[in-house]
Design a protein with these regions (language model features):
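A structural boundary/capping signal
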Residues: 1-154
């Protein structure tokens, strides 16, 4: 019986109790726009599609704690069925639903032929995020992250 209780405690901690986000802050759409422009993620042939007028952001450290808890990256990749765009949509939706952070964008990168996320933080510049393997990416790091043509939906 003790082993079952221990296993349930681990399950509760790992899958039910989400990390606390003590740094959640409200920002307006113009602040988000300036962050994206300053970081070079929008402009030219990369357009932003606005979703909200108010956004909630957190520190990168708190967001990293969320990523360690989230299991989107554990999904199985199935070409043309559950692929890059599905991972990116799912991760964005989970951030909205589970932790109330809506400053996670969906990037449709036509130049790279890929879809992924972009996260705006309260304490550091926005960064690109690959939800398939929980990794941070730099613009231009590889041919999949060129972001010279496409959309940032945020």
């Amino acid at each position: 019986m003790g082993e079952l209780i221990s296993s349930l405690e681990v399950f509760r901690k790992d899958y039910i109790e989400m990390p606390n986000l003590p740094t959640r802050e409200e920002k307006d759409g113009s602040w988000i726009s300036s962050q994206l422009m300053r970081a070079g993620f929008v402009g030219g042939e990369v357009k932003r599609l606005h979703l909200d007028s108010k956004y909630w952001v957190c520190t990168k450290k708190d967001f990293q704690n969320w990523i360690e808890w989230d299991w989107t990256n554990g999904k199985r990749y199935i070409s043309e069925e559950y692929d890059c765009d599905n991972f990116a949509f799912s991760f964005k939706a989970r951030c909205d639903r589970k932790i109330g952070i809506n400053a996670v964008g969906l990037v449709i990168d036509y130049s790279g032929g890929h879809a992924y996320n972009l996260v705006v933080f309260s304490d550091v510049a926005p960064e690109l995020f690959e939800p398939q393997n929980d990794s941070w990416k730099k613009k231009g790091q590889s041919s999949m992250f060129t972001l010279t043509s496409g959309y940032v939906i945020l």
